[in-house]
């Protein structure tokens, strides 16, 4: 099984930069407190790094 990372949205995307909102949406997060497991790929890591201040990452 491939490595995965748990990502949780902990802050609102209201008033944030459009590309940061797009990264959050690209990770599959919809609302505060929503948690998803994403594959640990360079593409997903890039999205996580761009919007790091809105997220909590485990794993």
Curated annotation (Swiss-Prot):
Provide one Gene Ontology cellular component.
cytosolic large ribosomal subunit
Q: Which GO terms describe its molecular function?
A: structural constituent of ribosome
Swiss-Prot/TrEMBL keywords: Ribonucleoprotein, Ribosomal protein
Q: Which domain of life, per UniProt?
A: Bacteria
Q: Name one Pfam family in it.
A: Ribosomal_L30
Q: Name one GO biological process term.
A: translation
Gene3D superfamilies named in the record: Ribosomal protein L30, ferredoxin-like fold domain
Transmembrane segments annotated in the record for this chain: none
Give the family per the record: Belongs to the universal ribosomal protein uL30 family.
Oligomer status and interactors:
Part of the 50S ribosomal subunit.
* Protein name listed in UniProt: Large ribosomal subunit protein uL30
Q: Which organism is it from?
A: Ectopseudomonas mendocina (strain ymp) (Pseudomonas mendocina)
């Amino acid at each position: 099984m491939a490595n995965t990372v748990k990502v949780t949205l902990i802050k609102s995307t209201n008033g944030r930069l459009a590309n940061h909102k797009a990264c959050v949406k690209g990770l599959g997060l919809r609302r505060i407190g929503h948690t998803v497991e994403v594959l640990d790929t360079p593409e997903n890591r890039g999205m996580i790094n761009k919007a790091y201040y809105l997220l909590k990452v485990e794993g």
